[in-house]
């Protein structure tokens, strides 16, 4: 895998240098309590020279032609690299949920498991989750599975 280390990137983050940038794509979402849906997303990883990546993700529900119907979700967070290829990730959702994730990376392959979660009184309660990220054919691939609302 060939990539450029961004200027000023903290050395701890070199293994995640491939993630830095803006990624756009489309996907499909499913959950037992709602109808399946198609979405478009934009994911941004950037840095300010400190030992964490800033993370921002937003998505939109799209129609069959790929046109935006309405906003869907937003997340912000921070990604930290720890010894032994361990990641610690904090993510807050616009819906009132904040999660702590722990996982590992192996080159451009990342697996995270939800370690702890907080839900605001008006938010759904998320009890578990798994996130996978990877570089596939030059594109950011990700999958997000969650357990919430008793499902």
Predicted features by range, described:
Residues 1-52, 60-71, 137, 147-150:
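Amphipathic/hydrophobic helical signal segments and adjacent flexible N-terminal regions
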Residues 19, 73-75, 129:
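Hydrophobic core residues within well-ordered beta-strands of beta-rich domains
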Residues 25, 53-57, 87-91, 110-114, ...:
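Short hydrophobic/aromatic-rich beta-strand segments that constitute the beta-sheet cores
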Residues 45-52, 80-85, 103-110, 133-139:
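A short, structured loop/turn motif at beta-sheet edges
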Residues 63-102:
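Helix-adjacent hinge/juxtasegments
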Residues 94-98, 105-130:
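Acidic, glycine-rich flexible loop segments
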Residues 120-151:
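Mixed-charge, glycine-accented linear interaction segment located at domain edges/termini
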């Amino acid at each position: 895998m060939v990539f450029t280390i961004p200027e000023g990137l903290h050395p701890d983050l070199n293994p995640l240098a491939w993630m830095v940038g803006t990624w756009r794509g489309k996907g499909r979402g499913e959950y037992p309590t709602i109808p399946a849906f198609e979405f478009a997303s934009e994911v941004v990883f950037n840095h300010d020279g400190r030992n964490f990546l800033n993370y921002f993700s937003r998505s939109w529900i799209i129609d069959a032609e790929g046109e935006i119907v309405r906003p869907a979700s937003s997340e912000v967070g921070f990604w930290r690299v720890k010894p032994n290829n361990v990641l610690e990730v904090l993510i807050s959702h616009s819906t009132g949920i904040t999660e702590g994730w722990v996982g590992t990376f192996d080159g451009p392959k990342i697996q995270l498991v939800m370690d702890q979660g907080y839900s605001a009184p008006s938010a759904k309660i998320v009890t578990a989750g798994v996130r996978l990220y990877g570089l596939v054919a030059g594109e950011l691939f990700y999958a997000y599975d969650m357990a919430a609302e008793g499902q």
